[in-house]
Amino acid sequence: MEGWGEISRIAATASSSVIDNSKITSLQFDNQQNLLWCGDSKGTTRSFTPQSTSIPMPYPALHLSQYSKFKTSLGTSPVKQYLNHQKGILSLSHNCVNFNNRRGLTQLSLNSESLKEPGFNNLSCMTFNSNTNNDLVIAGDSLFKVDLLKPNMTTSFNHTGKVSMIDNTLNYLTLGKSNGEIEIFDPVSNQTVKSFYGHNGLLSDIDVQGNYVASCGYSLRPRRNQASQSSYMIDPLVNIYDLRMMRSLPPIPFSAGASFVKFHPKLPNIMIIASSLGQLQFVDIYDQSNVYLYQADLSNVNASTPTTSSNTYLANLEVSGNGEFITFSDGFQNLHLWSFKNNNSKNFINFPSYLEQPDFSPPFQQNHINVDDVVPLSSIGMPYYKDLLLSNYASDLHFTKELSKLPNHLDPELLQNQYSQVLPYNTLKYGKRNLNKFYVPLQNNVSTKQKLFPKFISEKNGHDSFDNENSNIFEYKLSNKFEVPNCYSNLKIQYSKFGVEDFDFSFYNRTKYSGLENHLDNSYINSLLQLYKYSPVFQNFIIKHLLKEWLPNDLTTIIQNGNPQGSSILNELGYIFDMMNKSHGKNCKTSNFSNVLSQNQVAQMQELINKDDCKNLNAFEIRAIIGKFNKFLLSTCNNDLLNQFNTSLSEITNIGYEIEIKSNGCNINNVNYNSQLTVDLMSPPINKLSILISANSTSATKKNLNILNYLDYSMNQFKTIKCQQCNNSFPHLLEIRQSLVHLPPVISINVNFTGQEFNLIQNFPNWLVPEFYTYGMNNKVSFKLHSNDNLSNKYELLGYVCEINVGSEFLKGKHNLVSYIKIESKWYLFNDFLVMPIPESEVFDLSYHWKKPIIVMYQLANHADFGSFQQQSFAQLPDLNDSILYRDHFAGGIRDSIKREYELLTKDEAPNAGTLIAIDAEFVALNPEELEVHYGGVRNLIKPRNLSLARISVLRGDNGPKQGVPFIDDYIIHTCFIDDYLTSFSGIEPGDLDPSSSTKTLTTLQTSYRKLWLLLNLGCIFVGHGLQNDFRCINLHVPKNQIRDTADFFYLPELKRKLSLKFLAYILLKEKVQTGNHDSIEDANTALLLYKKYLELTAIGEFESTLHRIYMDGQQLRFRVPDS
């Protein structure tokens, strides 16, 4: 194998436009004709044929000219692989397989739609099934077989796992998996007969020759530390396997790192090995001392394109059928062709068939008119016309975007329902048709000039303030009732370089009622949680159970039942309600509730988990999921009450029914009682509505149907069925009557109507009533709109969850859920973190086609007031259980290996209002941040990383002998995947949070959270550094009067730079802290000492001068501690 070298090099995929240039992704020599196939990253296929030329070339002997060029993939998917066929060439891309003849005409295209196989995507490789050229085996996430003679269906093999490479032998398929494993698969028995584990990282290439398989790949590089990312290194060996004996043979060493390996097609003992850096080696596998080594020139011959290390690589190594040529590509769109010297052959195979040439039509003969400077253009005639030409417009006429008038978009739902026979056109929804609509130019549209989004807090100056006239985000009514006002829109949280803390939530809420953030998982539940929060009866009942203790810590609950937080839906709901009581208009998070919900097995089975902000749900699916969640919430809270405290929601939301079954034909007469927590509102049939209306009533009376008619029909049912016991001897009917016998203080009504049913209630102007009365007679409950006595119970509308449809109901990701809630005789709109007052007339106006009530809630009018915990009386509450502050409660019980670094509180040290405590928390990252990088290098934060509490330390802060002694030092148990332990910042090492190996004081999240919640309600003063971010990640709202944050004390707003705890300790305390990994006990104690120093400087009147000196010293030291 002497004398090999480069004989040709062409820029195969280069283009005159830099934008259109694309990389070579696949190469293949044709086995029928003298062609070399080349595929690029944009799905284009080219073929080249060798030709003799007299033009001087930089590489002698052979010139490649392009024979054909055509598109072979859908969109811009790259061509991954070629496969030769007698009648053409098969090309594989991400989601399709194309079969073209050699001129480029498409013969067959296989994709998920043509095969009716939704799993036919994410394809990676293909080959023929053993020795046939008609059965095509395609691999990716699954393994398929397609008959090219009958390409209308697929056959799936019994194989699981991602396949990245595939080849065939006489009897088997050789499957290369992405983890470095090679499987020998028998397509006849449909099973794997042997597996080889040659590489513990990735697989880069395999080749099959007879009964031998060769492979090369990567291995995992040992990590230098636990926090570093996994990396791979190229294996310096080529593995060889013998399929006759099903064992591996001695590997072939290749010190440069083997990236590609090919058997010589004519010399089975010769193997060609190549590295990505361009080193090629011909080696005899039976005599490995017989080696020929070459180095490819991967530099670019085009001087205009600089050569960089990112472009100098070798890829896509292939060998011709006669073994006389090899080809590969580099990073400059160059195709390299090699052969041995003195090779006069120009054929890639020994006996190539005739290469069909393109047909040329003779040129069309016509008399051309020569137009030059001498011949005027006006000599060429034009057709007769009367009107002015388009080019004849005034010189002062300009076309600008602001003056443009664009037509309205056609609603897709109109096109979908164009053949509907029931409601062919909804005038209420779309307005009158065939009208000349008035279009307003953009520059006259006032709404485009108004402000919808706030500035970041860091961008504001002292002159920025709220201005209702400059913002229309609170606009709830438009002149065009078919458009959705801004206050109902899907709100998006914007992130600056300072994260979510820089977003101005106060821009959207100027009330004392708190909104909920919507950038978390399962944020669709916000509107329903806000509705239940402002029901005094429901809220008071839920939060009073927080006084009691339920802290499961057994490993069965934590691991087997999938509840690592040791919490429940009931507890987390109570914490949310209490947090919203304390926040007084500040935004709140539902992260802990969402995590417990996501790990709830019942919620998973009912498909209530949503992690994409409902982007894949249409209007019907959103209505269904929020209705299911309403039932799930009440039933789960009821079960939690039974399991935890031996009580239930029966006194709050339980609706009682009597079901009577009787017959006149036999002696069946049964009466049963049942109950449910919610009501599924049913629309009466048309004939029932006509009975309710009465045929003799006037037109005005017919429009007075309301929700009470629907409630009465839904709760009082009557039907007849055949008696199964007596059907043969004496046929007769059974009468089944359901009657309402009890209504609770809170009535939760699910309104999951169809589109036609919603259209019907929009015709009733007073369908949603603000109040109604119930009467009890003969142990039955009936509804009345008005009352004339004191024997009835009065119910008032608390509010309802409303779906906002933007565009067609079939569109996904365009719709929103809001809630209208009546609080202290005033109505408010809650749209996640937007809260605003709204007129009562707007609440009861259901005539908008985009506005649909989904969950309606009524409550007794004589309900109690809202209850909340007060610091002065919290410790004296009779049901309070605060024993967790004075004892250990480890997850899985107390273990001997646990190392304690704290001293528990005693009853003599019981905290009370004003008790000073120092706190610091450490976190781990469960998910990395999501970034959007633009072509110009601009990075936008789409979603911040998800931090989870890992350690919490609380120290005694009052003056005394135990000042600075910790009494809480909890490590939070984690059973889920942790993306980054943030060891340099948190001090948490891998294994510290694992219940099977940790030596730390592991507790559940709810155990530690309850300790902080008790300290908060007891009135303790929290001292720390950067507490705003800590409390946000913990999901705990602490009022400002209970926070002493040293990051805020030692801060000059005009300089807009906050000082680190490490730097402040060095300047003020003359101590170096955080010299290694962070320790939360050390950080909390340092913050406590800084606070004491602040009090000392303030008392002697030197704080201001000291603060300015700190900043001056910081500028000289660049705010860094020397030698740190």
Swiss-Prot record:
Q: What are the UniProt keywords, alphabetically? A: Cytoplasm, Exonuclease, Hydrolase, Metal-binding, mRNA processing, Nuclease, Repeat, WD repeat
Q: Where are the WD repeats?
A: 19-58, 118-157, 158-195, 309-348
Domain USP: residue ranges: 484-861
Chain positions covered by the region annotation Linker: 351-484
Q: Summarize where a divalent metal cation binds, as residue positions.
A: 920, 922, 1030, 1083
Q: What does this protein do?
A: Catalytic subunit of the poly(A)-nuclease (PAN) deadenylation complex, one of two cytoplasmic mRNA deadenylases involved in mRNA turnover. PAN specifically shortens poly(A) tails of RNA and the activity is stimulated by poly(A)-binding protein PAB1. PAN deadenylation is followed by rapid degradation of the shortened mRNA tails by the CCR4-NOT complex. Deadenylated mRNAs are then degraded by two alternative mechanisms, namely exosome-mediated 3'-5' exonucleolytic degradation, or deadenylation-dependent mRNA decaping and subsequent 5'-3' exonucleolytic degradation by XRN1.
What's the protein called, per UniProt? Answer: PAN2-PAN3 deadenylation complex catalytic subunit PAN2
Encoding gene (name): PAN2
